[in-house]
Design a protein with these regions (language model features):
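N-terminal pre-transmembrane cytosolic regions of membrane proteins
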Residues: 1-3
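Charged, low-complexity intrinsically disordered regions
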Residues: 6-250, 271
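Canonical alpha-helical transmembrane segments of integral membrane proteins
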Residues: 252-264
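Juxtamembrane boundary at the C-terminal end of a transmembrane helix
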Residues: 261-274
């Protein structure tokens, strides 16, 4: 019995227009902070499609520049950072869903899409991992900023965790600022109608539950009157070594019994691609 051909959406720009969505060939990734290094290492979005409270696309590497201007003692100071990230070093499909308020930075690393190493582009430090009871730990590793463990449990209730397992068990999930973002290493096939059906299902299940669950969240570490804010320690997870360095370490460990000259050569090749 032959397999039925998958339905294709055709031209992405026309597909977006037909559905009342906006198509942009390139754009910035979602939920970037004012940190210059975060901006220049985040990659660039290609084929961005956005609707009411959500967006989707593909993030790849490339050249990025970010700058910040401020005045000090009557002097204008401009800081500019430029980085050329190899295009193929970042390749992530994503769906980002707007939430009602800013939240602590939380990451769910899906175990299903990991190889020897995590598939996350920016791996949080292991000390920030929060272990959970039940089946959830079999599907995801949860990371929360130090001191925000109870906040993470407030967000990821058992019913939301069950939806995450059912609908996004093969995808990495991140809550950053006021966005819930799911990622797929290697990208989503945006020309496949099934991809858009899955996006709609994730929005109506995970997205809807996350919205109602986080609407009443308050960070009691911030000053009264700033209820929509998150304390400085909760805004971003602390990162581990960049992926390229982790790969180098893994390769070096695998060849630990080989002559030191071989290990040094491996490090030099990997380092040149960072």
């Amino acid at each position: 019995m032959s397999e039925q051909p998958r339905e294709r959406v055709g031209d992405l720009r026309a597909f977006a227009a037909t559905n009342g969505w906006l198509y942009e060939p390139t754009a910035d990734p979602p939920a970037l902070s004012g940190d210059l290094w975060e901006n220049v290492t985040a990659g660039t979005v290609h084929d961005r499609v956005s609707g009411d409270g959500w967006e989707a696309g593909r993030i790849v590497g490339g050249s990025r520049t970010a700058e910040r201007v401020h005045r000090s003692g009557g002097v204008t100071i401009k800081t500019r950072v430029s980085v050329n990230v190899p295009t193929k070093s970042i390749d992530l499909g994503y769906l980002a869903i707007r939430l009602p308020r800013r939240l602590p930075h939380l990451v769910l690393d899906a175990r299903e899409n990991n190889g020897i190493l995590s598939s996350l582009q920016h791996q949080p430090r292991r000390s920030q991992r929060l272990r959970l009871e039940g089946d959830f730990d079999l599907h995801f590793h949860l990371f929360a900023p130090k001191g925000y463990e109870r906040d993470a449990l407030y967000v990821f209730t058992p019913d939301l965790m069950a939806l995450l397992i059912d609908e996004t068990g093969d995808l990495d999930v991140e809550i950053r600022d006021d966005m819930l973002i799911v990622y797929r290493p290697g990208g989503f096939d945006l020309a496949d109608a099934a991809t858009w059906e899955r996006f709609a299902r994730i929005r109506s299940t995970v997205g809807a539950k996350a919205w109602t669950q986080t609407d009443g969240y308050r960070d009691d570490r911030v000053t009264a009157g700033l209820s929509a804010s998150v304390g400085p320690d909760g805004r971003r997870l602390k990162r581990a070594l960049p992926r390229g360095v982790r790969v180098a370490v893994a390769i070096a460990s695998a060849f630990a019994l080989i002559a030191g000259g071989v290990v040094a050569a491996v490090f030099s090749v990997v380092a040149s691609t960072l």
